[in-house]
Amino acid sequence: MEEYEAQLLVVEQALENAADDAQRQDLLALKNNLQELLALTRESGDEAPIDELPQQGDNLDDELQRLKSELNDLEAAGSSQTALDEERQLADLRTKYTAMVGEKCSAPHEHSWGTCYHNALICGVDDEVVMNSEGVLDARLRVLFTNPTHREMLPCSYYLEGECRFDEAKCRFSHGALVTGSSIRKYNPPDFHKLSRSRPVFALLPDRLWHRGRVLCVNFVEQICRVRLDGQDHKERERDFKFEELYPLTTDQDEDDELSSEESNSSMNDNSSDEAESDMDDLEEARRARMVELSLFTFKPTERLGAWEEFTRGIGSKLMEKMGYIHGTGLGSDGRGIVTPVSAQILPQGRSLDACMELREAANGDKDYFSVERKLKRAQRRQRKADEKAYVRESQRVDVFTFLNDSVLGPGESTQQGEQVTKKAKTNELQQHSTKTLNVETVRIADEIRRKQRDMAKVKQSLDRNSGDAQLQKRLQVQMQSHKQELATLQAQERSLSKEQQTRKSKNKMFEF
């Protein structure tokens, strides 16, 4: 009797937990049979004859065995259903993670001081199944860190090529870290717009590891950043890095700025229009301060934008300044456009673009080959040379008044006589030297002439370069005149030596029979 009641309780509990309709029908039929059996047992009770007791006991035993077999079948069906659900869940997870292979993510890495997340690349799905902290089955992913900071995170180059002779436990480098799929996070791409002074960054060194440092200055035009590396083990602590060799780190200030921006947005929606205008003013001041800071770290050209308006009536730079442009920054709302103006170019008339490109390639790819500024400077140099030649021509020209002064008034005769006496004295002095001495003197004077011509070329370049400085032009003109006089003297000496050498050669030919 007690066994039947216990079995009835078990069947009722199974009915409460059963989800399948077929199982519920079987359990309900079994429950009805047990209730009928209990009712019959209570009615018959002690009235059953003695000879029927063994037969009734056999029926109860058979009923108990049948009940136990049905319970075992129900437990087996429930366990098989659970196993099927787990296999289906794992298959879905593997399909999901297999589709993620090749994608970038942020994966955890266990350091001595704790767990830290680093950017990584998913390269495969492990076969082993693990149980996460919440007691749910999960698969493990194999990831390679893209910004390794320690040697155990550095990917093995031989493993990537499939030639590593060591297994994962013996190799000093990483064959891929195993992390659970539920622990990965979204990939954090580098934001180079956040680069500013004292910003912490990771910098890539020749050892293929990313070392921590702080920004000293940034050149957004050439995309180069100077970083001071942390630690004392670097011989050159301050180095220049390209943007692709840097990874800006997120600071607490950035998180505070994001939170404050969200709070300011919510407050702007709740506050009045006056408060909204004040917030906009604050944002404008912050933007202007950032633009000024950007101008300090931007490449400075040799000439500021709009400097030519000093000599013209142009007002373009003034209008840009009225519209909010800050001198020293690039064009555009964020100040990251070009800093130097685009130079005007004039292409040859009647020539195709292909022909113009061929001309530029013939000039070794000179970008300023068709520049208007270069053509104007070339024309100025030609005009300057023509003016110099005209000045020399006019200075050497002898007019009527000079002829009368030199020939009629007398001092000219004495001057000519003095020059003739000087020439005769120099000729007599040259006749006293040997031919070898004359040859050595000729070589020395030729070297002096070449040196003097180089000096004159340098002075001429200085004149062209400093055309705007009047006082410097005067000093350079004096130097040029002095060099010209010395060059004329050297050339006269060279002519005298050449004449003497030619005279000696002629005499030698006359004495040969």
From Swiss-Prot:
Keywords: DNA-binding, Metal-binding, Nucleus, Repressor, Transcription, Transcription regulation, Zinc, Zinc-finger. Its main location: nucleus. Gene3D superfamilies: 2.30.30.1190. Residues 496-513 have a biased composition (Basic and acidic residues). Residues 252-283, 478-513 are annotated as: Disordered. Residues 252-261, 272-283 have a biased composition (Acidic residues). Residues 262-271 have a biased composition (Low complexity). A zinc finger (C3H1-type) spans 155-178. Residues 478-495 have a biased composition (Polar residues). It comes from the Eukaryota. One of its GO terms (biological process) is negative regulation of transcription by RNA polymerase II. One of its GO terms (cellular component) is nucleus. It is found in: Nucleus. The keyword Transcription applies. GO terms for molecular function: DNA-binding transcription repressor activity, RNA polymerase II-specific; RNA polymerase II cis-regulatory region sequence-specific DNA binding; zinc ion binding. Residues 312-358 form the G-patch domain. PROSITE patterns: G_PATCH, ZF_C3H1. The keyword DNA-binding applies. Transcription repressor. This is Zinc finger CCCH-type with G patch domain-containing protein. It comes from Drosophila melanogaster.
